[in-house]
């Protein structure tokens, strides 16, 4: 665990790089990571942005709007995590790894104040002994973690994959 002064110093560093962050969000994020590290000393972390599609208004096709409210409900992020876990469990079953428990750690925040369009920032935590890389995320047809993440988001939104796969964005420094 971080001491209060260490958490304050971390917040200064984070805010210098990314902008303002809630001290409560930072504290919770550090706790999630610490708890995951206590279970798995070797951790693979993935940073990803999950976006909503934009649908033009019928009267003005050039004016973007957000996706229908029924999809923007809080359950969409829950469906995302459930779909990703389901895909991983199915893969583990196919590979005969059903006896070994699997844990997915995650941190998420919905950005809607500083952005024109609401979207999620997500960090996924994996036991590095099980999963240690995204794979080629430029290939939508690959059998890798990047594809599973994209499929999970499309399923959460109830949209077709790979048609909406680009709604998932992996920043250049996505893997840790």
Predicted regions and their residues:
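Intrinsically disordered, low-complexity regulatory regions enriched in Ser/Pro/Gly/Thr
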Residues: 39-42, 100, 114-117
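Short glycine-rich, low-complexity/disordered patches
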Residues: 47, 88-106, 159-176
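Histidine-centered divalent-metal-coordination microenvironment in nucleic-acid enzymes
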Residues: 105-131
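Short N-terminal edge-element motif at the start of the domain
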Residues: 54-103
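Active-site-flanking beta-strand signature of metal-NTP-handling nucleotidyl enzymes
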Residues: 43-59
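Catalytic micro-motifs at enzyme active sites that drive phosphoryl/nucleotidyl and oxygen chemistry
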Residues: 33-37, 96-97, 105-114
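Short, solvent-exposed secondary-structure capping/transition elements
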Residues: 57, 93, 118, 129-136
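Catalytic "initiation/cleavage/transfer" segments centered on a nucleophilic residue
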Residues: 2-40, 128-176
């Amino acid at each position: 665990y971080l001491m209060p002064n260490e958490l304050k110093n971390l917040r200064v560093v984070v805010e210098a790089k990314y902008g303002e962050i809630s001290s409560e969000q930072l504290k919770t994020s550090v706790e999630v990571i610490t708890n995951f590290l206590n279970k798995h000393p070797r951790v693979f972390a993935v940073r990803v942005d999950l976006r909503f599609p934009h649908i033009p208004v019928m009267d003005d096709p050039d004016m973007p709007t957000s996706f229908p409210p029924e999809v923007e409900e809080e359950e969409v992020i829950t469906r995302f995590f459930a779909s990703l876990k389901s895909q991983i469990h199915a893969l583990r079953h196919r590979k005969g790894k059903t006896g070994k428990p699997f844990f997915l750690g995650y941190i998420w925040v919905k950005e809607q104040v500083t952005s024109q369009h609401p979207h999620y920032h997500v960090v996924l935590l994996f036991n590095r002994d099980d999963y240690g890389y995204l794979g080629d995320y430029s290939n939508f047809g690959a059998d890798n973690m990047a594809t599973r993440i994209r499929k999970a988001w499309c399923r959460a939104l109830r949209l077709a994959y790979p048609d909406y796969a680009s709604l998932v964005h992996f920043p250049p420094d996505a893997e840790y």
